[in-house]
């Protein structure tokens, strides 16, 4: 019986939410292990649409335990707002089915303000963050001045911790020409929220260890994508956390041996939000058409996603850096009807052919894709639930992707609906 880690194999927005929800039916526990409320996902269940940002997908399934791990940065107000919205849709959320790591780092309003100030000041050099305070919160965590959930349980020592945090942030704000923050206001806000947050607090590493020893199935839910990893992504156009599969262990307090099967999610084409290199980007009518068909707009921000052909070089690289055992290929139906589709099989960099994305920012911007043209298919793949329902040419496309990235397709998604999924290999039984 394997635990399963789900990671994005591209730049995020690959359809992880649907796949995690589909897998969560077989899991006992669903765990978020990195990121914050900057990476939203949409789930469609029985015709009802749910939009999640911070909460694990497991909250939508009765009898499942959802967990937010220590690797997440946690915005208390965003959490309370999301819980209220889901409860309004009839979703039961309480400490009975949701636990939050007591040592999770909190995102405060000052983090959001700093994030926005930096992005706006950078102008053309902006990274393209969601301005939700994710990066500044991780900075405070590494700088050992962050406020953590457990700190709200001791209001006697909390003022000292707030003062230590503000010694840093007020110095920054003075330099940016912004008014200083009053420690009393932060203390009042956190004190007011504490009774609503602390009932969820848990020693998550211990909880998960106990559950694992009991034989419970654990599903680790990654946010964003491996190409946004702060170390292995397209730096500096990345997020502020590690998004590769190994973070599932660090971000929950479980040992690497508990991780198990790694499932990488990727679209049948490529998208990216925000700035940064994108070798296969299509700025023509085809790119626009893919975006229209795929409804490529951010769940949280509404930002338009950049679209391009499938990049086998990048996905192959992610397969290696994440140790991916199988892929879940999504949105194959978006390519229905094209006369032909292109797949990037390599790059040219300064006249030389290479089979990987270099780490340097300048080199990443200069690489040129080498394409292989594959015949398209006219018959629809949408809503298919078996290989027999797929056009022969669509199957050839999937098989070619497997060859190029060196990894089998374990799941194939043909619509946003949970049931429209073709299972090749069950990750929990691999």
UniProtKB/Swiss-Prot annotation:
SMART domains: Adenylsucc_synt (SM00788). This is Adenylosuccinate synthetase. Pathway: Purine metabolism; AMP biosynthesis via de novo pathway; AMP from IMP: step 1/2. GO terms for biological process: 'de novo' AMP biosynthetic process; IMP metabolic process. The keyword Ribonucleoprotein does not apply. Binds 1 Mg(2+) ion per subunit. The keyword Nuclease does not apply. HAMAP family: Adenylosucc_synth (MF_00011). Homodimer. GO terms for cellular component: cytoplasm. Belongs to the adenylosuccinate synthetase family. It is found in: Cytoplasm. GTP binds at residues 12-18, 40-42, 305, 331-333, 413-415. Its EC number is 6.3.4.4.
């Amino acid at each position: 019986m394997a635990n399963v880690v789900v990671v994005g194999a591209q730049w995020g927005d690959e359809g992880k939410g649907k796949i995690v929800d589909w897998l969560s039916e077989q899991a006992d526990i669903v765990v978020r292990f990195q990121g914050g409320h900057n990476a939203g996902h949409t789930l469609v269940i029985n015709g009802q649409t749910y939009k999640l940002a911070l909460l694990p997908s497991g909250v939508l399934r009765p009898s499942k335990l959802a967990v937010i791990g220590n690797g997440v940065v946690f915005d208390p107000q965003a959490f309370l707002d999301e819980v209220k919205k889901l409860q309004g849709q009839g979703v039961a959320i309480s400490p009975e089915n949701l636990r939050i790591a007591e040592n999770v780092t909190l995102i405060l309003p000052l983090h959001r303000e700093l994030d926005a100030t930096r992005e706006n000041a950078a102008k053309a050099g902006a990274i393209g963050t969601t301005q939700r305070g994710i990066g500044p919160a991780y900075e405070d965590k590494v700088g050992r001045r962050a406020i953590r959930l457990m700190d709200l349980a001791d209001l006697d020592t909390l003022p000292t911790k707030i003062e230590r945090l503000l010694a840093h942030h007020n110095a920054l704000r003075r330099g940016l020409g912004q008014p200083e923050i009053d420690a009393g206001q932060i203390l009042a806000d956190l004190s007011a929220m504490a009774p609503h947050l602390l009932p969820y607090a848990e020693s998550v590493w211990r909880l998960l260890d106990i559950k694992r020893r009991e034989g419970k199935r654990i599903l680790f839910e990654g946010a964003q994508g491996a190409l946004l990893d702060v170390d292995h992504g397209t730096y500096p156009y990345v997020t502020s956390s590690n998004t590769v599969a190994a973070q599932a262990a660090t971000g929950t307090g479980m040992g690497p041996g508990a991780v198990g099967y790694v499932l990488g999610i990727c679209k049948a084409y490529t998208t990216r939000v925000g700035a940064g290199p994108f070798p296969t980007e299509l700025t023509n009518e085809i790119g626009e058409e893919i975006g229209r068909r795929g409804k490529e707009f951010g769940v949280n921000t509404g930002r338009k996603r950049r679209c391009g052909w499938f990049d086998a070089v990048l996905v192959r690289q992610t397969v290696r850096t994440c140790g991916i055992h199988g892929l879940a290929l999504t949105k194959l139906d978006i390519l229905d009807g094209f006369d032909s589709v292109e797949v990037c099989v390599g790059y040219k960099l300064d006249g030389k052919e290479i089979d990987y994305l270099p780490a340097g920012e300048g080199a990443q911007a200069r690489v040129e894709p080498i394409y292989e043209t594959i015949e398209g298919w006219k018959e629809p793949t949408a809503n298919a639930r078996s290989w027999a329902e797929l056009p022969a040419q669509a199957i050839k496309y999937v098989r070619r992707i497997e060859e190029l990235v060196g990894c089998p397709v374990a799941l194939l998604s043909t619509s946003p609906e949970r049931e429209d999924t073709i299972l090749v290999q069950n990750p929990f039984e691999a």
